[in-house]
Amino acid sequence: MRDWGKESEYLHSTRRHLWNNDYFEFLVKCVWKIDKPVKIIDFGCGYGYLAQLFLPIIPKGSTYKGIDISEQLIENAKEIFHDNSEMVSFEVADLNDYKPTAEYDVVICQAVLRHLPNSVQILKKMIDTAKDGGLVICTEPSRRLENAGVYIDSTDFYPFENDDYLEQKWIKEIKSGGRDYQIGIKLPIVMERLGLKNIGVRINDYVDYVRSEDKDEISRFLSDHDVDSEFSDSNGFVAARCHVISYGNK
């Protein structure tokens, strides 16, 4: 399994280009309607990125707890939130073994299930962790949507280049019991099968656009989106990461 603790720079960079803050606030206040203090738990929290989004906009008296397998990322999170210890806490734990000691109003994960071979079992655990009526939220990319969402203004760019590779990789991993690259797009159906109610689906709104003169940003873009450096002299770069936001009530 990938050691995300060694990829902190990548995580910080890509997370900065996932959400527009005003859209996340719209989800919290107008879609999920979090208008009273809540207890939030974040499965696979990394360095606490979702806490950075939640804390400025959730009602006073709310709390957030983050769980992650990486000791390095949890230490990073504790450093970031050292002044918010009353509202925020973090714990190192493997999600497969984690046993919550409380029930939560909001149970959330972001870009976690796609990396797990037992994503449905972890989703079941998330549901079990929610209070009756609690909200379960999964923000997950679909690899096919991600691949289709990249455009580079170059005559050498072929948007279908990775399609055959992704198909074979996906089939191989499914047959071997590996991770499901399509879990993001499947989640509303899986949630309903597992008994969640009031299923809703959104998509994140951020589009990563880089102009040809922004050389530092071009390097960042190529790294974030796994694009070959041969395209570094192209005329423009656009990527819509297309994270599917699925949610429902227990």
Model features per residue range: what roles?
Residues V120-D132:
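A short glycine-rich, Lys/Arg-flanked "PGG" loop and its adjoining helix->strand segment in the class I
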Residues K99-V107:
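A short acidic, Gly/Pro-enriched loop at the edge of an enzyme's catalytic core
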Residues D180-I185, G200-N249:
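Conserved Class I S-adenosyl-L-methionine
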Residues M1-V38, Y49-L53, I57, L73:
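Conserved class I S-adenosyl-L-methionine
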Residues I137-V210:
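Conserved catalytic/acceptor-binding region of the Class I
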Residues Y47-D97:
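Class I SAM-dependent methyltransferase SAM/SAH-binding core
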Residues V106-V120:
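A short SAM/SAH-binding and catalytic strip from SAM-dependent methyltransferases
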Residues F43:
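Conserved beta-strand/loop positions that form the S-adenosyl-L-methionine
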